[in-house]
Design a protein with these regions (language model features):
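Secreted/periplasmic carbohydrate-active enzymes, especially glycoside hydrolases
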Residues: 1-344, 348-352, 397, 412-413, ...
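Substrate-binding/catalytic cleft of secreted carbohydrate-active enzymes
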Residues: 207, 319-321, 329-599, 605-606
Length: 608
């Protein structure tokens, strides 16, 4: 049986979890010689490197920061003798982008994709009561079949350079926690829940997957009080007077799943879950049957020095800022985030649109970062010669994202792609496959969407009919008709909106991106583009448009904070559309948003 499991590592009476985070050994491998040279049995001439973190911004020389190719991590871990008889596994929260894992010189796993977890069972390879060697060979090169998409160029000096088709920096490394686990041979591999509200409480339907045949029980606890129980791998928990999970009023129960062999407990897995429903009816988003207007951000996992590496201090600051400003939602642009962010969203009562890392799916000549550097290669997406491998990778990432995140109360929708080229032949078949797969995989049948790029309009967006709600990325007043032209920008914006009104067929619309680059030190009277005054004028124009259309049911501004991108003439040390600086301090627009969002009722437009 396939023992793959994306359950978050939790210690229990039957499970042991040890963190392997810390200072590892590290070195580049520009000639790709490490495997043949047996570096998996000992990494020569290494330097120290923190895990989790991106390697890039620790270096002071550009060649190291921009390194593209193979690179290695190595550490040692101890396996206690009392773990004998259990399955020993090593789990990576993520590693960017292509990974090969070795234990004591033996290859134990390979993984493609830099934003989702994977593990390796190493029971037969580890040595007990002594230290073992863990080596990881990573590669951060980009290609047109991967998520996210790009290519890799070679300079005249022979050095490789990443040419992303996406507008964020190609950070690389072991970005999320690494865990050593001791697991029972027969164990819980997965579970799923879906919720129904009843007149006197709620019902939680569950399904449990194990790798054995022993009996299963499921219990639900409110603190230390058991409020529901059931037996069997499928069943229903009946919760009287259920306390529902809600926006900024999150309530979490503990679900406890056990495998029994007579009176003995073979395995126990526990996790926090919230009871809530989310659906679309009559053009509105309904949380627990009540309308909710989405307000918040597109974000990035991005911060000074650690790059894309998980940093709980930054995560905490971000949530405090989002609470302060009155936000209730964010999109995990443009990839699934670390699991710890979803856990905090569950705790704090934030809504998440969860996005697979399908970004850069346009002709690269249309991507100003790649084209600006001369690295653009004209590629039409969803063509016959590119689709099979791309689609296979896309399906794998979508499957793992839903498998990992399906039980989070905070996750309300799936975003299948960001700004794809959706006007070309092959779009409809490609999109239908993925939207159908998302519906099939998700027990809760959450709404599905994708972020529609500026040049995709109501009459030529061939995939929009598959979306349960429309998500637009629009930059009227910035990339088009900026400055004095903002008056014409508003007119053009409204003309497009009138076109969308004819094809929505009762679906709601949200804006998943809108924003203007703004230097935090730039004030100008009268305003000019890049000044804080212009950012506020731009936002006012957009909000006037949003407020004019009842079918607009959400606004997620781009971006929460300034973030790093590939260098180029269009980016001044990164994307500066943040409402906060990269150091998480407010620009003037933050106070602008706080005034707006804290005054809008949760059910804004809910009766229209």
């Amino acid at each position: 049986m396939n023992n793959k499991s994306l359950l978050y590592p939790v210690a229990s009476t039957s499970r042991r979890v040890v963190s392997l985070d810390g200072m590892w050994r590290f070195r580049f491998d520009p000639k790709s010689e490490g495997v043949d040279a047996d570096w998996a049995n000992g990494l020569p001439e290494s330097i120290s490197m923190p895990v989790p973190a991106s390697f890039c911004d620790f270096f002071t020389d550009k060649e190291s920061r921009e390194y593209c190719g193979d690179f290695w991590y190595e550490t040692d871990f101890f396996v206690p003798g009392e773990w004998s008889g259990k399955d020993i596994a090593i789990r990576f929260g993520s590693a960017t982008h292509h990974a090969r894992v070795f234990v004591n010189g033996v290859e134990v796993a390979q993984h493609e994709g830099g934003f989702l977890p994977f593990d390796a069972v190493v029971t037969d390879i580890v040595r007990y009561n002594q230290y073992n060697k863990l080596s990881v060979l990573l590669n951060n090169e980009l290609n047109e079949y991967m998520l996210p998409a790009g290519n890799t160029a070679t300079l005249s000096n022979g050095k490789k350079v990443a040419a992303p088709y996406f507008d964020f920096y190609n950070y690389a490394g072991i970005h999320r926690p690494v865990k050593l686990m001791a697991l029972p041979a027969e164990r819980v591999l997965d579970y799923s829940v879906k919720h129904r509200l009843t007149a006197d409480g709620a019902e939680v339907d569950y399904t449990v997957t194990t790798n054995g045949s022993h009996d299963v029980t499921v219990e639900l606890y409110d603190g230390t009080t058991k409020v529901a129980e059931a037996s069997g791998k499928e069943g229903t928990l009946v919760v009287k007077d259920a306390k529902l999970w809600n926006v900024h009023a999150a309530y979490l129960y503990n679900i406890v799943i056990r495998i029994h062999d007579g009176s003995a407990i073979v395995d126990e897995y526990t996790e926090k879950i919230g009871i809530r429903t989310f659906e679309i009816q009559n053009g509105h988003f309904l949380l627990n049957g009540k309308p909710v207007y989405l307000r918040g951000f597109g974000k990035h996992e991005d911060a000074d020095i650690r790059g894309r590496g998980l940093d709980l201090a930054t995560v905490k600051r971000d949530y405090e800022l989002m609470k302060w400003i009155g936000a209730n939602c964010f999109r995990t642009s443009h990839y699934p985030y670390a699991e710890e962010l979803y856990q905090m969203a569950d705790e704090e009562g934030f809504l998440i649109i969860d996005e697979v890392p399908a970004v850069g799916f346009m002709e690269s000549t249309m991507n100003f970062l790649a084209a600006n550097q001369g690295n653009g290669k004209k590629v039409g997406w969803f063509e016959k010669e590119t689709t099979p491998q791309l689609l296979a990778n896309h399906k794998d990432a979508l499957t793992d994202m839903i498998d990992r995140d399906k039980n989070h109360a905070s996750v309300i929708a799936w975003s299948i792609l960001n700004e794809p080229q959706c006007t070309s032949e092959g779009t409809e078949a490609y999109f239908k496959t993925l939207f159908d797969l998302a519906h099939e995989l998700d027990p809760q049948k959450r709404p599905r969407t994708y972020a529609i790029v500026m040049m995709s309009l109501p009459h030529n967006s061939k995939g929009q009919q598959f979306a349960d709600f429309i998500s637009l990325n629009r930059y009227y007043g910035w990339y088009v008709m900026g400055g004095m032209g903002i008056v014409d920008a508003e007119a053009a914006f409204r003309k497009e909106m009138d076109g969308w009104a004819k094809v929505l067929n009762g679906r709601p619309m949200i804006f998943t991106e809108y924003g203007a680059d703004t230097m935090p030190t730039e004030h100008k009277l009268p305003s000019v583009m890049w000044s804080q005054e212009y950012q506020n004028e731009y936002l006012d124009m957009n909000h006037n448009v949003f407020d004019s259309y009842d079918f607009v049911q959400g606004e997620l501004v781009w971006n929460f904070a300034d973030f790093q991108t590939t260098e180029g003439i269009m980016r001044a040390n990164g994307n500066k559309k943040g409402i906060f600086t990269r150091q998480r301090q407010p620009k003037d627009a933050a106070f602008h948003f706080r005034a707006r969002w804290t005054s809008l009722p949760l059910d804004y437009k809910g009766n229209k």
